[in-house]
Amino acid sequence: MPQSSLLGPLLFLLYINDIHKSSKEFTFYLFADDTSLTYANDNLRTLELTVNNELGKVSEWLHANKLTLNVKKSNYVIFRPRQKRIPFIPQIKIFNPTLNTRVILEMKDFVKYLGIMIDSELSWKHHIDFICHKISRSVGIIAKMRHYIPRHLLLNLYHALIAPYLNDGICAWGNCPQTYLNKLLVLQKHALRLIKYLFS
């Protein structure tokens, strides 16, 4: 199946649709070729043991279905309250078929999933910083274009370049601390003032 074909993603999803049967402990989230696994346990030692055991089962399922996990793109995050420290870093391992051995996955403070930056404390700081960076660039574009194109096209630019970042995943990050939301509000107001500037 060609990589960029229209049927490719659908057929791949059908092919891996029963991967969840490989483990009773994980919750699987599948989107196109992006798969995320979650597991919850208050005891870090139990978590380490269970996750390693279950990842072994997932690896066996992948091998049986002639699929290879991209170990370089695989990592994990431990979600926890800000005040709770991790007493040790769990060694989460997955089988690497290229090296024919188990390798330790990298623990991250945050991960990007479907365009949303999710950090270990669910503070959404990384995601807000990411959005602010993207919106700042778009505000710069509007600032340059405001003298050359009519207002309705500037509004189109706003809805194409800025609004999607403000709307995407807002159900997840929209309840973040007000100080983070204020950063977005300042940028949004700046963009709208630039659009209004022509007619003020």
Where on the chain are the PLM-derived regions?
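Structural signal for well-ordered, non-membrane alpha-helices
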Residues: H20, G56-H63, S136-A143, A163, ...
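Short, charged alpha-helical motifs in flexible N/C-terminal segments and linkers
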Residues: S59-I78, C171, Y180-S200
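Basic, alpha-helical interaction scaffolds
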Residues: R102-A172
